[in-house]
Amino acid sequence: MRIVLFCHSLLSDWNHGNAHFLRGVVTELTERGHEVRVFEPRDAWSLQNLVADHGEAPLREVRDVYPHVDPIRYDLASLDLDEALEGAALVIVHEWSEPELVARVGAHRAGASYRLLFHDTHHRSVTDPGAMARYDLTHYDGVLAFGRVIRDLYLERRWARRAFVWHEAADARVFRPRREIQPERDLVWVGNWGDEERTRELDEFLIGPARDLGLSARVHGVRYPEHARAALEAAGVEYRGWLPNHRAPDAFARARVTVHVPRRPYVASLPGIPTIRPFEAMACALPLVC
């Protein structure tokens, strides 16, 4: 069947973890014989930051690794939904989409026969419910929530009539053990700074132990402020900046262990909803400290 997905970006995973899971989903559906069309905004901030820092080469690399990921980039003002959704049997709109797009697709669904689902993989329903209430899901057939807590909130607050749990998982085509690579260091951690949502946790569970145990350690990620980079350097931890997600299996293979350092909102308000990183590490057979 023809499936249409609207998301922030599949081309860029710069500070954008949703791309990890969705790339795998698109690949899986395509290889099962479905036709998948992906739409992402031309001005997606993740992609803009990626290109500004690293140029176009990473985008070509993503297409090589994920040949089925070939999104159509659109401008919201000129997006023709009749054309975009022609022949669709299923339409999925990801939560990192503009409320205007969510509402327009919902209005289009009112006069169409496809199934329409809203996909939520973020903590805003707990930490910023006012923002989530802006999404008009009146004509949506249901919500795909990445954990039971989120699913229950949609139902309790009557944001949606139906909601289902759909946990994220690693793409085992890309995330697999690389037995031919020998470890070069003790610890690797792949993750972004986190908008001050896990500053204390990073010091307690990553930076401090690496310093106190004298571990050879490397960190990949973006948006690390100067004080964070200074703390890493003082602890003897090598900071290497952004790492394309499809290269993470290689980084995992070159280390003996990694750690899971969740953001505070997930620990405090979203029990049972780990981010995708632990699954990616375990899929690569890397020991994981939680």
What is each stretch, according to the model?
Residues D171-V257, P265, R277-P278:
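Conserved catalytic-core segment of nucleotide-activated headgroup transferases in glycan assembly
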Residues H8, W96, H119-H123, H167-E168, ...:
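Histidine-centered beta-alpha loop that forms part of the nucleotide-sugar donor binding/catalytic region
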Residues A268-E280:
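A short, glycine- and acidic-residue-rich donor-binding loop in the catalytic cores
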Residues S9, N15, R23-T27, R37-Y154:
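Extended catalytic core of nucleotide-activated donor transferases of GT-like folds
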Residues A19-L29, E204-F205:
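Short amphipathic alpha-helix
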Residues E280-C290:
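Short hydrophobic beta-strand element within catalytic cores of glycosyltransferases
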Residues A89, A253-L270, L286-P287:
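Acidic donor-binding loop of glycosyltransferase active sites
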Residues V149, W166-A169:
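Carbohydrate-associated surface elements
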